[in-house]
Each structure stands twice: as C-alpha cells, then as structure tokens.
C-alpha cells in the first residue's frame, strides 16, 4: 500500500513519516544535497520539502486556468538541474521545464526535429546541449549543438519502456522494463547490451 514519503534517521536507525503531500504515490525523489528534497507524486504534482523545517516550501500543481503551469499532476520523473531549472516528466503529457524555478513551464521541444508533447516520459538526462529522454515508446537522443536527433525502439532496444538513464564515463546506461540494461555511445549513436563481467560472451543482466 502507498505510504507517501518515509524518512529514515541514520543516527537513530528509525523510520518516520514526513508531512502529507496530498498524494501517497511517490514516483520520484531527489535533493540538492543540502536542505531541499524534491518530490514527484503520481496525482498531486511536484513538491519542494525543507528537510530541516519538514515543511513544503514550494509546489507545482496542474491548474486548468494556468497555461504556463505543468500540464498534469501525474508526474513520472523529476529533475532540478545545476542551473535551477525544473524538469518534469509526465504520464502521456510530455516533458515540461521551468527556467530557474520561476514557475512558468513549457513543453520541451527542439523544432522541427523533436517535440516531447504527448510522450509518456519516464526518465531523462540533461547535459546542456545534449539530452537523452526515455519514454514508454523508446529512447530519444538530442544534440542541439550538432542538430542530431535519433530515436531508438525495438528491436534495437530490448524494451521500449525506459525507466532510468545514467551518464558515466562518456556513455549513457539505459535501464529498461523487462529488457535488462543497455549502453548508448553518444559519439557513434550505437547501442550495446550491458554484459556481466569483462568478456563479450558473458550473460546479459536481466
């Protein structure tokens, strides 16, 4: 059963509940490493929680009268980048972003080659001009500096549902639902299976 956000005190080795966010289905959580915890819910938008005060300091919720707000309260993924921009991945509503947390959102697009509207966004990595976006319908690579946009779907991918993406040592590690993990090389735009061990004959993680 959904429990909302649960806090674990390392020193006391005990669990406790945080304040109510109006929705106990938590889809993503991260922090700035200092004071603020960023929380995405599947039903009540985005919340910024003060770790010290245990209070919500800011929230983004869908409002039909606000054309510059987030377009859905069903949030699948959330990122606050090092420039203070808030990136919000929705269920079947694309990817929103807000410059410098000013509360004004717009759908991410790189016209005319890519538009995230109507995509169900599950994961993404933003590295300035280079972005990798995971959805329920495959993987998208966008390089705004070179003008390169490429999509990957089955059978090139082991699964079209991309749950998580991580950049490490020049490559993107792609976690799929039911298809194990793959590795994307941004230089060659090639995908390979992530294999256990150091030899190419090792079994793929499942």
Regions found by a protein language model. Name each.
Residues 1-206:
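Carboxylate-rich, polar loop motifs that coordinate divalent cations or form catalytic acidic clusters
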């Amino acid at each position: 059963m959904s429990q909302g956000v649960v806090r674990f005190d390392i020193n006391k080795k005990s669990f406790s509940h945080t304040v109510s966010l109006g929705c106990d289905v938590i889809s993503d959580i991260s922090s700035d490493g200092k004071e603020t915890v960023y929380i995405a819910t599947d039903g009540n938008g985005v919340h910024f929680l003060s770790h010290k005060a245990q209070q919500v300091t800011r929230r983004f919720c869908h409002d039909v009268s606000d054309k510059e707000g987030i377009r859905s309260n069903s949030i699948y993924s959330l990122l606050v980048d090092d420039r203070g921009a808030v990136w919000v991945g929705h269920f079947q509503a694309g990817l929103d972003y807000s410059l410098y947390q000013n509360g004004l959102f717009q759908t991410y697009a790189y016209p005319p080659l890519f538009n995230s509207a109507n995509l169900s966004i599950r994961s993404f990595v933003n590295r300035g001009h280079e972005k990798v976006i995971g959805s329920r319908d495959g993987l998208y690579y966008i390089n705004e500096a070179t003008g390169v946009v490429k999509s990957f779907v089955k059978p090139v991918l082991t699964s079209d549902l991309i749950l998580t993406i991580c950049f490490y040592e020049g490559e993107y590690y792609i976690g799929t639902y039911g298809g194990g993990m793959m590795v994307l090389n941004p230089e060659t735009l090639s995908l390979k299976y992530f294999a256990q061990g150091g030899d190419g004959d090792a079994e793929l993680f499942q």
